[in-house]
Regions:
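Conserved glycine-rich
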Residues: 224-225
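Short conserved segment of the HATPase_c
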Residues: 185-198
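Conserved catalytic submotifs in the C-terminal HATPase_c
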Residues: 117, 122-132
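Short alpha-helical segment of the dimerization/phosphotransfer core of two-component systems
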Residues: 70-75
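Conserved micro-motifs of the catalytic ATP-binding
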Residues: 90-95, 132-135
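Detector for a conserved hydrophobic position within an alpha-helical segment of the HATPase_c
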Residues: 219-220
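PAS-associated C-terminal cap
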Residues: 1-15, 19, 246
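Conserved C-terminal segment of the DHp
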Residues: 44-59, 88
Length: 246
């Protein structure tokens, strides 16, 4: 066998071993997270059912029933998110294809048009038309949409939001970035937890602490890497790297 082909096969095997090792560590941590979250939901249901059993006032009973309905919706949401994480961490051989990066950013921008217009947001996309990665389309769609949604969600209330999206080939890598001038993140305080499951860093009622975890997991499942730079009240930049060969 040609030495270059043998070397390529060796690199592919090493990469597969590394990915599998990372996924196994995630699943071990995931078991603890499931246990913690389901116990929390169970305790909430038990408490509300206890209140309902002891309550005699009909108005108060209805209020508790509404709270039970909300608790049920929250549980379903949690199970849905956990299911997504399981799928990412256990399906490493999902069919891949060439994914046009600019196409997915344009589609995400179109989906978010109502929010963009309502909040007078400026989005600039500077990506070569033919720049692509070898990945999983559904993962890539979620990654792009989640990062743009985050930028919009965590904008500064009294400042026009500008989002700059760039993409290029660099030193054998496909690199694209999403830069905003939003409220930013204190990385000295939160950097080591930024991509953790159920970690939130802002007082936003919509924050669930799952989006960035799923985003990072999907990027890594496709052989990529994500890094972040940020400064409070200045903005945040996410950079995603994929090998050209993927």
């Amino acid at each position: 066998m040609d030495i270059s082909v043998l070397k390529q096969k060796e690199n592919e095997l090493r990469h597969l071993i590394d990915v599998t090792s990372v996924q196994n560590k995630k699943l071990a941590n995931f078991a603890h997270i499931i246990s913690h979250n389901l116990r929390s939901h169970s305790a909430n249901f038990s408490m509300l059912l206890g209140f309902l059993k002891d309550e005699t006032d009909e108005v108060e009973k209805q209020r508790i029933l509404n709270m039970l309905s909300d608790a049920s919706s929250n549980l379903l949401g949690t199970l849905d998110n956990l299911n997504k994480v399981v799928e990412i961490n256990t399906h490493t051989n999902v069919a891949r294809e060439h994914v046009n990066i600019k196409k997915y950013f344009l589609e995400a921008k179109n989906i978010l048009t109502p929010k963009i217009k309502k909040n007078d947001i400026e989005i600039n996309i500077n990506i070569p038309q033919n720049l692509s990665v070898y990945g999983i389309p559904s993962y890539f769609e979620n990654i792009v949409l989640n990062l743009l949604t985050n930028a919009i969600k965590y904008r500064q209330p009294n400042k026009k939001l500008n989002i700059n999206i760039n993409g290029k080939k660099e030193f054998g890598k496909i690199v694209f970035s999403i830069q905003d001038n939003g409220i930013g993140i204190n990385l000295n305080r939160h950097g080591d937890k930024l991509f953790g499951m159920y970690k939130t860093f802002h007082n936003n009622s919509d924050a669930r602490g799952i989006g960035l975890y799923i985003t990072k997991s999907q990027i890594e499942a496709m052989g990529g890497n994500i890094i972040v730079s940020s400064e409070v009240n200045k903005g945040t930049t996410f950079k995603i790297y994929f090998d050209e060969g993927y």
